[in-house]
A protein has these predicted regions:
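N-terminal secretory targeting modules
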Residues: 1-22, 37-200, 374-383
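Substrate-gating cap/lid alpha-helix
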Residues: 301-339, 364, 383
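Bacterial N-terminal signal peptides
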Residues: 26-36
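Oxyanion-hole/transition-state-stabilizing segment in secreted/luminal serine hydrolases
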Residues: 213, 225, 242-287, 298-305
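Histidine-centered active-site loop/cap adjacent to the catalytic His
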Residues: 352-383
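Short helix-loop-beta junction
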Residues: 222-235, 326
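Catalytic nucleophile-elbow at a beta strand-turn-alpha helix junction centered on a G-D-S/GDSL motif
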Residues: 198-219
Length: 383
């Protein structure tokens, strides 16, 4: 019997039916009792706590607002990117609780879902609970996508077994998060938890890194890489805006990181790659002289399959990327180029729109890049 609804049973008696019904009265009373218990469970009181009082992970540097990725009052960013800095992409709340139920109330902007994204990824929440040392999917906070689209209230999971749980709640991929409250059983305990990930790997890139077309908020490849490896992966993906700008290079140079992974060849043209690559690396190297810098070759976009214009643009871009990185590798032994071939496979089913990987696309991508990234990081004791 669902615990989300209340039920009322009406029994109408008359002289012709009274006796047959009376024969089944015990069964009716039992059914009524079960439904009453269900109604009582659905009305169990919930206590909400401000998620900002728990542990928020996933930021490269601290911010005044709890769910922003970059504090734009302190750091200059490229002109078109401040709004993306307010997206809590890759951020998560980690906490312990013995509650059998987890709910959430949260507030986003009122913008409509994008045409190539799932609303539950763009505006929703994605919960994982640790089981036998692994982060296991537990449920989602489904956003409201009618009306103003800005205030949401959802049951993420209920009827869990008793006992303490370690929880990892990913925040929306592609919308501003203004407020978040986590609801637990009134008499249960909920408390901050230490960051469960180790080291610090900053992943900077395009909409592919941002997670456009991922199925849930925790399914961008950097988040999956973190859960797979236990490494603390920071998502600094900015949809359409990663072209090795000096503002981003300056910001990254201030971040203490054990390694950087770059998806920085997806947005710029070959000309921009040739113009900006060396200056971008030079800025980061001033404060990170020996930190491993891992550059990913951009994906092969399906949009080039029949367009001669896109084919030419993409081919030239990929050639420029490889040439620039390999030339720099001649004088810098801590720079790496990861090009495992066709990142998204050859079956034409791994993107939402010819460019942005779906969960399947990210699986193909990780199958190819994760072993190489692990091998590189292992040289530096990053495991």
């Amino acid at each position: 019997i669902s615990s989300d609804y209340n039920y009322t049973i009406f029994v109408f008696l008359n002289t012709k039916t009274t006796l047959p019904i009376m024969k089944h009265l015990p069964l009716l009373l039992l059914l009524g009792g079960l439904l009453s218990a269900s109604a009582a469970r659905s009305a169990d009181p919930v206590r909400y706590v401000d998620a900002a009082t728990l542990t928020v992970i996933g930021k490269a540097l601290s911010t005044e607002q709890p769910y922003n990725r970059i504090d734009t009052t302190r750091f200059r960013v490229p002109a078109k990117t401040p709004g993306y800095c307010y997206h809590p992409t890759g951020l998560a709340v980690v906490f312990r609780t013995d509650s059998r139920t987890i709910r959430a109330r949260w507030e986003t902007s009122g913008k409509n879902p994008s045409d190539n994204m799932a609303a539950v990824a763009q505006k929703g929440l994605d919960l994982y609970i640790r089981s036998n040392g692994e982060w296991v999917f537990a449920g989602v906070g489904r956003p409201k996508i009618n009306g103003k689209n800005d205030r949401h209230d959802a049951a993420i999971i209920s009827n869990m077994a008793e006992g303490e749980k370690e929880c990892l709640l990913y925040l929306p991929l592609y919308d501003q998060l203004k407020k978040l409250e986590i609801g637990v059983d009134e008499k249960s305990v909920i408390a901050p938890m230490e960051n469960p990930f180790r080291h610090k790997i900053v992943v900077h890139g395009s909409s592919i890194t941002h997670g456009i077309a991922a199925g849930r908020a925790g399914m961008a490849y950097s988040s999956r890489l973190g859960r797979d490896t236990g490494l603390y992966c920071i998502n600094l993906g900015f949809s359409g805006q990663c072209t090795m700008q000096p503002e981003f290079a300056s910001y990254l140079s201030r971040v203490e990181a054990d390694a950087f992974v770059f998806d920085c060849f997806s947005n710029p043209s070959a000309e921009v790659i040739n113009e900006r690559f060396d200056a971008f690396v030079d800025t980061i190297r001033r404060t990170h002289p020996t930190t491993p810098l891992i550059f990913l070759q951009t994906i092969r976009r399906e949009t080039r399959n029949f367009s001669t214009r896109i084919e030419k643009f993409e081919r030239e871009k990929q050639a420029a990327a490889e040439a620039q990185v390999r030339d720099r590798m001649k004088t810098d032994k801590n720079i790496y180029f990861v090009d495992p071939g066709d990142l998204l496979g050859s079956d034409h089913i791994a993107t939402a729109d010819g460019t942005h990987p779906t969960d399947l696309g990210f699986t193909y991508m990780l199958d190819r890049i994760e072993p190489q990234i692990r091998k590189i990081l292992g040289k530096y004791g990053i495991r």
